[in-house]
C-alpha cells in the first residue's frame, strides 16, 4: 500500500476569501464573472485538486464580505463549468430548508450526468433569517428541527437516486423497448416531513450518488455529517480542536455502520503564499491595510449570532447562548478562547485575518509543514483551500505549494480516475433496489 495522501479542494469565491481580498490590485471583484470562475477551475484542475466548491446564500447580506452580497446560483454555475473542465470535481451548495427532495435529486443527478460523474452536493440547513423571509417565513425553523428535516430530506434524495438501476434504459430500436420496467422503481416515501412517490425522471447517475458534503459542527450537525457525509468541511481554529472533531466524527461514522475512510474531514484553510516567508508576510501585511474595521466586527457578530460590538474588545470573550442561527463558530471559538485565555480582540483580529478560519502564511516549505503536521497528526484527511484572493493567491498555491507537497509524497501528481468518487477514494454506492445476483445452479461435475 502506498503512502497515504491528502485531499484538496478549493472554495471558489469571486471576491476572494480574505475579508478584503477583493481590494487587492489584480484580484477578481465579482461573484458574477464566469471567466473568473473558469480560471479558478482551470487552475484547480492543473493542480490536480479533488474539487471546486461553490457556496451559496439565499439572501442579500449587508455584511463586510462582498462574497455574501452578489453571487451566482451554484448549480447553474457548476453546470457551465462542467463544459470547460474534464477532471475537477464540482461541489455546490443547496439548502434542505428551502427546496424539495425531488428538485435537488434531479439537479445534482443532472450535474453528475453533464460532468461525467463529478458532482457533489453540500447539504446545508440555512442559518439566515433573511433567507427565511425570502421564502415566506418570518423566522428560521428551530436549529434541531432544521437538522431533523435535513436528515429525512437527504434520505429521500438518496432514495430517488436509486430509483433507476444501472441498465434501466434499454433503447432497443428493433423491439421498440426504451426502458426495463423491472429496473425502475417507485420510492413511495411517506415520512414526517416529506411524501415523495418517485421514480426520478433521470437514469442512475454515473457515480450512483453524487458525493455528499456537509459542514455541521453542532451535535445534530455532526450526526448528519456522520450518517451521510463523504466530505466534511469543518470549521476548526486549531489542530487540537480539529483532531478532537476528527475523532468524534469518525467514531460516529463507524457507529452508523460506515467505514471511517469513507468520510473525509477537510477543514477550511486560508492561505497566503510567497516564494519566501518574508514575501508572504509582506503580502499579508498589504492585505491587512485594506481591511475595514467595521466589516470584521459585522462578520464576527454574524458568526456568533449576537451583536459583539456591545462588548469591550480587551475584555474576555463573553459566554453567550447558542443562537438559532449558527452554532458551529460560537462553540469552536468560545472553546478556544476559554482554553487559551483569549480576549475578544484576539477573535476580532482572527476574523479580520481569515474570517474565522485558520490561516497559514509563508513560503512553500512553511505552508507544507503546517499542512503535513495536521495531516500526519490525525487531525484532517486534507483541506478545503480558501485563497485570500483570485487568481494570484490561488495560483501561488498551485505553482509553489503543490510541487512541494508532491515532492514529499503527500499529494497526487496526476488523477487516477475520472469521477469525484475516484479522486476521494469513495466506492460507488450500492443500489437499494438492485436484486442480488442469483446463485449459479450448475452442478459440479
Q: Which residues are covered by each model-predicted region?
A:
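Substrate-recognition/cap regions that form aromatic- and gly/pro-loop-enriched pockets
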Residues: 329-400
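Active-site mouth loops of central-metabolism enzymes
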Residues: 20-35, 93-102, 138-140, 206-219, ...
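C-terminal helical cap(s) of enzyme catalytic domains, especially alpha/beta-barrels
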Residues: 135, 142, 153-158, 243-251, ...
Amino acid at each position: 500500500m502506498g503512502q497515504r495522501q491528502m485531499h484538496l479542494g478549493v472554495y471558489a469565491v469571486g471576491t476572494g476569501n480574505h475579508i478584503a481580498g477583493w481590494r487587492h490590485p489584480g484580484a477578481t471583484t465579482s461573484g458574477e464573472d464566469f471567466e473568473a470562475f473558469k480560471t479558478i477551475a482551470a487552475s484547480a484542475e492543473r493542480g490536480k485538486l479533488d474539487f471546486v466548491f461553490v457556496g451559496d446564500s439565499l439572501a442579500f447580506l449587508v455584511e463586510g464580505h462582498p462574497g455574501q452580497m452578489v453571487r451566482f446560483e451554484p448549480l447553474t454555475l457548476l453546470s457551465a463549468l462542467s463544459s470547460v473542465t474534464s477532471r475537477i470535481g464540482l461541489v455546490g451548495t443547496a439548502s434542505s430548508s428551502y427546496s424539495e427532495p425531488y428538485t435537488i435529486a434531479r439537479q445534482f443527478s443532472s450535474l453528475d450526468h453533464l460532468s461525467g460523474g463529478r458532482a457533489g452536493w453540500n447539504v446545508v440547513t440555512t442559518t439566515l433569517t433573511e433567507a427565511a423571509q425570502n421564502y415566506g417565513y418570518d423566522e428560521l425553523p428551530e436549529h434541531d428541527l432544521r437538522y431533523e428535516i435535513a436528515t429525512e430530506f437527504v434520505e429521500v434524495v438518496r432514495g430517488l437516486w436509486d430509483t433507476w438501476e444501472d441498465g434501466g434504459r434499454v433503447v432497443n430500436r428493433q423491439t421498440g423497448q426504451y426502458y426495463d420496467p423491472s429496473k425502475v422503481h417507485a420510492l413511495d416515501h411517506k415520512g414526517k416531513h416529506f411524501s415523495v412517490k418517485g421514480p426520478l425522471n433521470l437514469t442512475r447517475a454515473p457515480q450512483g450518488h453524487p458525493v455528499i458534503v456537509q459542514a455541521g459542527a453542532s451535535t445534530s450537525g455532526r450526526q448528519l455529517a456522520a450518517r451521510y457525509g463523504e466530505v466534511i468541511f469543518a470549521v476548526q481554529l486549531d489542530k487540537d480542536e480539529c483532531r478532537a472533531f476528527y475523532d468524534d466524527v469518525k467514531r460516529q461514522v463507524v457507529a452508523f455502520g460506515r467505514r471511517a475512510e469513507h468520510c473525509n474531514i477537510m477543514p477550511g484553510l486560508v492561505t497566503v503564499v510567497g516564494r519566501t516567508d518574508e514575501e508572504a508576510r509582506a503580502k499579508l501585511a498589504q492585505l491587512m491595510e485594506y481591511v475595514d474595521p467595521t466589516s470584521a466586527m459585522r462578520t464576527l457578530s454574524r458568526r456568533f449570532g449576537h451583536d459583539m460590538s456591545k462588548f469591550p474588545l480587551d475584555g474576555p470573550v463573553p459566554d453567550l447562548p447558542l443562537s438559532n442561527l449558527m452554532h458551529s463558530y460560537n462553540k469552536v471559538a468560545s472553546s478556544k478562547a476559554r482554553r487559551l485565555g483569549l480576549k475578544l480582540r484576539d477573535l476580532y483580529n482572527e476574523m479580520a485575518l481569515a474570517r474565522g478560519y485558520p490561516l497559514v502564511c509563508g513560503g512553500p516549505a512553511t505552508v507544507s509543514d503546517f499542512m503535513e503536521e495536521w495531516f500526519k497528526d490525525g487531525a484532517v484527511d486534507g483541506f478545503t483551500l480558501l485563497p485570500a484572493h483570485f487568481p494570484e493567491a490561488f495560483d501561488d498555491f498551485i505553482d509553489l505549494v503543490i510541487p512541494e507537497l508532491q515532492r514529499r509524497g503527500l499529494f497526487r501528481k496526476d488523477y487516477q480516475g475520472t469521477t469525484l468518487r475516484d479522486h476521494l477514494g469513495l466506492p460507488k454506492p450500492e443500489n437499494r433496489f438492485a436484486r442480488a445476483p442469483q446463485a449459479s445452479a450448475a452442478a459440479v461435475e
